[in-house]
Amino acid sequence: TDYFLEELGVEKFALLGTDYVYPRTTNNILESYLKDKGIEADDIFVNYTPFGQSDWATIVADVVALGEDGKQVGVISTINGDANIGFYKELAAAGISADDIPVVAFSVGEEELSGLDTSNLVGHLAAWNYFQSAESEANADFIAAWKAFAGEERVTNDPMEAHFIGFNMWVNAATEAGTTDVDAVRAAMYGQEYPNLTGGTAVMLPNHHLAKPVLIGEIQADGQFDIISQTSEVPGDAWTDFLPASAVLKSDWKELGCGMYNVETETCVQLTSNY
């Protein structure tokens, strides 16, 4: 979002998502964040579509219409699955390039692009904590090992790096604890560090989230990403400050033993998960 605002000069936002909890929660946070940054409510367009949505003509027309006053429009997409193919195809059919209306996707990565005709997607963006194109010796070794195991045509992606880091942290924590007992390993996990494949170091925080860099990649014709922006490690926050209901909440399992601690009432709202 900051990249859109600061680097691309986006003034109007289309928040497009598949109709389920992740896009709705993400867009609620984004709406609040954008308004906090001075974006007017009338300059934020939100739309949800079912899984597998194939008819994008009306929605793309609505997005294009946002820019009729000359303001720069950008799309933040939490569209999932095959619906992405139709969305980008409709953008191209309408003559809209990434230079005209940039799209940054939170759900499109190397695996989703593998084997697809990416001609309609070239130049658009995606945001992850990892891209296969990251240049580091550790990443080169990781990619080589994966291709040797799964086949030369297979790609790596962000969830794979997250699993790689998490598993290695667990091994180190279990080794330190001298046991695989859950409580002992969990106590040893806090503060664990492991190298990111993009460079830098991932750190396990007391809220069970990692500190990791945020990367923005530009889609290339071969389905890979050209990394155009990378932050330093950003601490993962279990509860966003941009929604009133969660702004008062804190997650700290190490000192407070609570994942949903209300800092105003100084009480643990919930000790156990709903799931």
Regions found by a protein language model. Give the residues of each.
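Extracellular/periplasmic Venus flytrap/periplasmic-binding protein
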Residues: 1-94, 133-141
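Rossmann-fold dehydrogenase core element
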Residues: 118-129
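Cofactor-binding loop segments of dinucleotide-utilizing enzymes, especially the Rossmann-like FAD-
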Residues: 18, 106-108, 129, 221
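Extracellular/periplasmic ligand-binding modules, especially the Venus flytrap/periplasmic-binding
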Residues: 21, 80-86, 131-193, 211
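Solvent-exposed, acidic/polar segments of extracytosolic/periplasmic ligand-binding ectodomains
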Residues: 191-275
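Venus flytrap/periplasmic-binding-protein-like
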Residues: 96-119, 162, 186-195
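Pocket-lining segment of extracytoplasmic ligand-binding domains
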Residues: 47, 72, 110-115, 135, ...
